[in-house]
Amino acid sequence: MSEVERSPEIDRFRGLAIVLMVFANYFAGISWVPAWLKHAPDIGFTCIDVIAPLFIFAIALTYGASYRRSIASRGRRETALRFVRRYAALVGIGAILSAGEVWFEQGQGAMNWGVLQAIGVAGLLALCFMGFSPWIRLLAGGLILVVYQILLDRFWLEIVLDSSHGGFPGSISWGGMLIIASGIADLINGKGEERAPTGCKKIATSEPKIVALKFIAAGLIFVAMGAALGQLIPISKNRVSATYDILSIGISAVIYGLASSSFGLRKWSGKMRVSDGSAMSNSKITQYRQYGPITQFLVWWGRNPIFLYILHLFVLGIFALPTAPWWYTNAHPALAVFQFLFIVGILTSIARALYQKKIIINL
């Protein structure tokens, strides 16, 4: 994998998103967990509602760079086929898992439209816009959200509310979120500024602190926009409303900026040494970062995020499938914490082993 894709900051962010997904999915089935630690039933926003957008944002951080590298090495046709296969595979895997869920529930209810299907369709939609500049992606993503919101309010509301993650129509909104987030990431990371409007050509920088601050600043702008528009359009994860997308993009950008700049930071700067052991000249002093065990733990998870997400669904089944209420639904807090730590421990052991063996499982 390339240096961009294997950026420790992005791996840590991916890992954080997946760990939080495991937390949300496990405790969603526990009866005594308070409402603010579960998804809002419809209109409203809880801290859990931002977890899926965190992973969408993590995908957006490398989508554009990965697409451009693939174009350079494989050409446009092979690149398009590669990305179509990747995201179509997510839809297919998600459908198989959803069918298995229906089978275990003995056919009760409709087949679930899961996170993997939503990400897969969003990725396919975003692929149509990856060849455009970040500024065009920002505009296109915004237009998609506007059109989706109109269709939602006039035609799709009942269908979307009857489906998890908004069903197929909701995936259009997730796609708009991914397109906008990729535009933000490429602008700040320095891709596309050559085609930016004259007054905006100096957005990008390679300075880590400044990059982090710009993600935070961009995030706060989107948070303010989402909160303001929320007075007109309900903020709802279940509806995947435009205001939910805008607010979630903002929160995700702020969290990424904070995490990449300071989370687990022990040391920020120092002199690097060249291969012969001599100190670099003052003009070549390079900043570096050293991280503690918590952030290293997240890097393990972030190396194979999709694989660990799929795997956690099977491990979660050990606790969620038995029907005895005391075992899961009404589990004692101590038992629930033990079960959650067991799931995290198993997955961390696997994540660490894959990391140490330098195994990366891609679709």
What feature does the model see in each segment?
Residues 1-363:
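Alpha-helical transmembrane segments and their immediate juxtamembrane cytosolic regions
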